């Protein structure tokens, strides 16, 4: 039987070197910054500590059991969200693990649709994250109401481009 907590730890535990790339609503890089993420289990608690290397600022997220909003697949990939910011705005996060590499996406939707995407490239300690060239400009194509962003080869983000305003 699939144990999401054990699977999450099996594939995500360790020290990850990363590069966060902030994209605007058109898939154009706004800025990027290096990070370090430590994922470990201590006394039954999963501890995640993200360090922004340029400033030394740290953010932590700790939990004993997998949050009810988190889905974990057998390969260690996970999704978290959507988390409501306001009645019409939300954010969601998705992670895909492939061996010692991982890609994460944090998408923020506002009142009128997509506001911002943070594309995260991570490699387990011992390797440098292989971030896309600067500045990143996603290749974009449409398929009906969907927009497909391609930040790098073999990675596609399927986004709902419909306007969300009420009225």
List the predicted regions and their residue ranges:
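Soluble ligand-binding/transfer domains with enclosed cavities or grooves
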Residues: 5-13, 17-167
């Amino acid at each position: 039987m699939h144990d999401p907590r054990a699977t999450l730890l099996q594939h995500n535990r360790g020290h990850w070197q990363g590069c966060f790339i902030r994209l605007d609503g058109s898939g154009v890089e706004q800025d990027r910054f290096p990070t370090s993420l430590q994922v470990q289990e201590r006394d039954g608690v999963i501890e995640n500590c993200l360090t922004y290397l340029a400033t030394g600022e740290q953010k932590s997220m700790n939990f004993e059991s997998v949050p009810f909003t988190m889905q974990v697949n057998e390969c260690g990939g996970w999704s978290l969200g959507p988390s409501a910011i306001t009645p019409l705005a939300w954010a969601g996060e998705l992670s895909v693990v492939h061996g010692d590499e991982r890609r994460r996406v944090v998408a923020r939707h506002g009142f009128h649709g997509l506001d911002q995407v943070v594309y995260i490239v991570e490699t387990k300690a011992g390797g440098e994250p292989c971030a896309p060239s600067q500045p990143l400009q996603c290749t974009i194509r449409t398929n009906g109401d969907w927009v497909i962003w391609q930040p790098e080869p073999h990675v596609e983000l399927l986004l709902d481009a419909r306007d969300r305003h009420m009225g």
